[in-house]
Amino acid sequence: TRHSIRSKMGWNGKFVIGHAGRFTEQKNHKFMVEIFAKVHEKYPEAILAFAGDGHLMDEVKAQVKELGLTDSVQFLGVRFDMNELMQGMDIFLFPSLYEGLGNVITEAQAVGLRSIASDVVPNEVKMTELVDFISLNKSADFWADAILKYKDGYIHKSRHDDLKKAGYEIKSAARDLEKYYLELVGRKM
């Protein structure tokens, strides 16, 4: 799947930094573009792939154009194949300004994709060694260097067992939910 996705998306021979999320202030796309500009300056074979849409997309596209990065940034729109796309990516970038949980980080870990997220994302999302947290107070250059540590290839490996141990497995989640409901019903009787 990785090779076919990379071929289909034009990612062969590239270092692909991905993101999925609505184009809103919360997701911090403008900072992502600043980070990517620093990455691209140091490693021109990098590509930034955005999945999603939202009211700030045009502003982000204008920023990309202004920085001369149009040929290296892809706007993929709303996607229903993120699992496959993530398998073709090399790293997932998530510098949110605030976040409830950040479920997309869980999805990235499930396919073995390393993620670099802001330290406002709750620690509970880290179920494997594949998540690094960085302060939003750090510069775009600092973030770029953290990303580039992984440019020489990370082997995607299923993290199903890690996720299962962390409680993200449908059968155990269903049992936990059933137990919770039974406790609630028991209290009302």
What do these predicted ranges mean?
Residues 105, 114-118:
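Short hydrophobic beta-strand element within catalytic cores of glycosyltransferases
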Residues 15, 19-38, 55-61:
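A conserved mid-protein helix/loop that constitutes part of the nucleotide-sugar donor-binding site
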Residues 61-77:
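Nucleotide-activated donor-binding/catalytic signature segment of Leloir-type glycosyltransferases, i.e.
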Residues 17, 32-33, 48, 143, ...:
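A structural motif in glycosyltransferase catalytic domains
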Residues 154-189:
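A charged, aromatic-enriched C-terminal amphipathic alpha-helix characteristic of glycosyltransferases
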Residues 1-10:
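A short helix/loop element that forms part of the nucleotide-sugar donor recognition site in Leloir-type
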Residues 78, 97:
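Aromatic "clamp/platform" in nucleotide-sugar-dependent glycosyltransferases that forms part
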